[in-house]
């Protein structure tokens, strides 16, 4: 009788290492939603969730204008493209408005990237500047069951 061989995906390998390799340092920072009109969408979300304050910021390097709504345990980030080469513009053309990514915050993004790469996780580019002075990078959706995931580290 031959031994049974199980194929292990990147996601399974990553999840198997959670308890051993400090993944408990991660927490949900925000859920990002691509929208056509960030001002209108921000008003809709403010009314729906009774959020008083919204922060607006343009991130030139990413080609987006964002509205950040602060909830008790996480944030909602609404993203509108500011130019035709924005990845959000392409996302909207292909899929329409909707969930774009989930962001996880870590205290040390460089260490977390190194750890995750050791688990076989693939990244889309290097660590770079994000909104509100954060450092960010994105995990390839193929590494985590089709979900685009951002890692971020606050100053």
Language model: regions and residue ranges:
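N-terminal mitochondrial targeting presequence
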Residues: 1-24
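Vicinal oxygen chelate
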Residues: 6, 67-70, 104, 110-155
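N-terminal beta-strand motif that seeds the catalytic metal site of vicinal oxygen chelate
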Residues: 18-42, 97-106, 155
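A cross-kingdom feature marking solvent-exposed beta-strand/loop segments within repeated
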Residues: 27-29, 41, 48-63, 83-100, ...
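Short, structured motif recognition centered on aromatic/hydrophobic residues
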Residues: 28, 42-45, 69, 76-79, ...
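C-terminal "cap" of GNAT-fold acetyltransferases
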Residues: 59-75
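Short, charged/polar surface micro-motifs in flexible loops or helix N-caps
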Residues: 72-76, 83-85, 109
């Amino acid at each position: 009788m031959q031994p049974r061989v199980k194929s292990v995906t990147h996601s399974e390998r990553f999840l198997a290492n959670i308890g051993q390799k400090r993944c408990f340092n991660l927490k949900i920072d925000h859920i990002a939603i691509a929208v056509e009109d960030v001002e209108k969408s921000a008003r809709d979300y403010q009314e729906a969730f009774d959020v008083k304050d919204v922060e607006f910021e343009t991130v030139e390097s990413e080609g987006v204008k964002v509205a950040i709504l602060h909830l008790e345990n996480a944030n909602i980030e609404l993203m509108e493209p500011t130019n035709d080469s924005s990845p959000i513009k392409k996302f909207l053309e292909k899929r329409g408005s909707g969930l774009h990514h989930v962001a996880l915050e870590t205290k040390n993004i460089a260490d977390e990237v190194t750890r995750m790469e050791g688990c076989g996780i693939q990244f889309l580019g290097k660590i770079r500047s994000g909104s509100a002075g954060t450092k960010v990078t994105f995990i390839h959706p193929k590494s985590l069951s089709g979900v685009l995931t951002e890692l971020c580290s606050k100053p």
